[in-house]
């Protein structure tokens, strides 16, 4: 009898959840966990209501408000009627369909991809979906997680299944030790800079190597979070003792004999020696610098010690024109030193970098310093529990004393769907995940960086090399 064929982590999770495969490769996949927020769910719930259907597995569904909630005084009415309507609709739908729901006054409320792991709702080996593109965050725990559209949200609510076609496998190996000042955010920006925003199209990425294993769980979440910016369907990291330690004791995590049984399964969740990957990429962590994006795509990356590139050097006409447009939108001139670029705003938060370790890194930079008089800087914790922990550690006092605004949890300035927006041509150092035109506000200019880099820029008034920070 021949030995079983070596399989990847993605293959294992996929096969464990495959309900049916048609001749054309279309598959029906069982979904273990469904995260829901106020923006992509109203039509889905209304579809159920119209058809007279129930939520198939309410205990496997978790709802939270995050995109539209104000991060300032929540005792006042939401200033945007459409946002207020979506928030009210989610509360009503959660109540009517028996779904667990964290409203804006619940300390467990926060960005959906922060609260999932925080509550132990995210578990290794599970399939997780949400009507949000950054669902790949949960892959840090060895979960197969990706975003879905509103019609698919309704399908999962009704059936706890999803129609899919299997993606290909790509492994990204990052070996070596990260230099001081270089973070998980720089790793994923470097990867996107290497493969481009379409390089991962049709793939699920598995992140491996010494540098990935050395990351904390929060760092791993940052890496997996931006898999979609590289075009990938999802990102995965094999679970290990760090993942188990993070999850143990969380409110929704298994306990007792159930935990022990889960651990036995989780220990099988790694790619076998000799498993086939359709594409491989390797990076040397030791060679990575702190990174700043300069354009209007996450692939527009450069070292903080670099200069704004000249599109004239690009041979491909379509790409050259695209980069010329990006520079015009960003109001930048080729050859400008990155450290000479001044900022107007700073945002630390989002499902990419709104966790406690991110806030600690920023506070370390901010302590004893003062935000530049020309910069408005806001700190938005990823959840009420992150906010509570930060305040217990006194981080809020460090930020406020330095001149940063300390806010309530939510998606905030990551996207222009709430009161936290850039004015036209305002330039922002942001720890979020997208620097598209208008992402943070009409004609707003976004530069993606790590939390420490963002905090340092807010204090200096321009980008600085965090490795030189004193």
Curated annotation (Swiss-Prot):
Its EC number is 4.2.1.33. It catalyses: (2R,3S)-3-isopropylmalate = (2S)-2-isopropylmalate. Signal peptide: none annotated. It comes from the Bacteria. Binds 1 [4Fe-4S] cluster per subunit. Pfam families: Aconitase. Its cofactor is [4Fe-4S] cluster. Keywords: 4Fe-4S, Amino-acid biosynthesis, Branched-chain amino acid biosynthesis, Iron, Iron-sulfur, Leucine biosynthesis, Lyase, Metal-binding. [4Fe-4S] cluster binds at residues 351, 411, 414. Belongs to the aconitase/IPM isomerase family. LeuC type 1 subfamily. Heterodimer of LeuC and LeuD. Catalyzes the isomerization between 2-isopropylmalate and 3-isopropylmalate, via the formation of 2-isopropylmaleate. This is 3-isopropylmalate dehydratase large subunit. It comes from Rhodopseudomonas palustris (strain HaA2).
């Amino acid at each position: 009898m021949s030995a079983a064929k070596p399989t990847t982590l993605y293959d294992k999770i996929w096969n464990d959840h495959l309900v049916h495969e048609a001749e054309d490769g279309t598959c029906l996949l069982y979904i273990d966990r469904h995260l829901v927020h106020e923006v992509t769910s109203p039509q889905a719930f209304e579809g159920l209501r119209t058809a007279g259907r129930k939520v198939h597995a309410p205990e496997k569904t978790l709802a939270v408000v995050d995109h539209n909630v104000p991060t300032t005084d929540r005792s006042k009415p939401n200033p945007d009627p459409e946002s207020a309507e979506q928030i009210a609709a989610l509360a009503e739908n959660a109540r009517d369909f028996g779904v667990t729901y964290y409203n804006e006054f619940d300390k467990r409320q926060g960005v959906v991809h922060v609260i999932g792991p925080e509550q132990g709702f995210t578990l290794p080996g599970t399939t997780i979906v949400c009507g949000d593109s950054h669902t790949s965050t949960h892959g840090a725990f060895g979960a197969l997680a990706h975003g879905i559209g509103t019609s698919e949200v309704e399908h999962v609510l009704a059936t706890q299944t999803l129609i899919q076609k299997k993606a290909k496998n790509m492994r990204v190996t990052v070996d070596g030790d990260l230099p001081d000042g270089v973070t998980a955010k720089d790793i994923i920006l470097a990867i996107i800079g290497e493969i481009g925003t379409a390089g991962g199209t049709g793939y699920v990425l598995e992140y491996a190597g010494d540098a990935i294993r050395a990351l904390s769980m929060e760092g791993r979440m940052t890496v997996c979070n931006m898999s979609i910016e590289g075009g990938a369907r999802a990102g995965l990291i094999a679970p290990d003792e760090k993942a188990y330690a993070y999850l143990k004791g969380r409110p929704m995590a298994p306990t007792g004999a159930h935990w022990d049984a889960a651990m036995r399964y989780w220990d099988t969740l790694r790619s076998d020696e000799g498993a086939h990957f359709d594409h491989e990429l390797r990076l040397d962590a030791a060679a990575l610098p702190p990174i700043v994006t300069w354009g209007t795509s996450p692939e527009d990356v450069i070292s903080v010690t670099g200069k704004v590139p000249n599109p004239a050097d690009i041979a491909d006409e379509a790409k050259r024109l695209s980069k010329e447009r990006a520079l015009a939108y960003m109001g930048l001139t080729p050859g400008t030193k990155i450290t000479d670029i001044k900022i107007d705003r700073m945002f630390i938060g989002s499902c990419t970098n709104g966790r406690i370790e991110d806030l600690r890194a920023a506070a370390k930079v901010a302590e004893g310093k003062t935000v530049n008089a020309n910069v408005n800087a806001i700190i938005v914790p990823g959840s009420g529990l992150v906010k509570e922990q930060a305040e217990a550690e006194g981080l809020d006092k460090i930020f406020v004393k330095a001149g940063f605004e300390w806010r309530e949890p939510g998606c905030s300035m990551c996207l222009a769907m709430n009161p936290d927006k850039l004015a036209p041509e305002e330039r922002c150092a942001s720890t979020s995940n997208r620097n598209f035109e208008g992402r943070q506000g009409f004609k707003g200019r976004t530069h993606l960086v790590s939390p420490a880099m963002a905090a340092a820029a807010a204090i200096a008034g321009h980008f600085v090399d965090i490795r030189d920070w004193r």
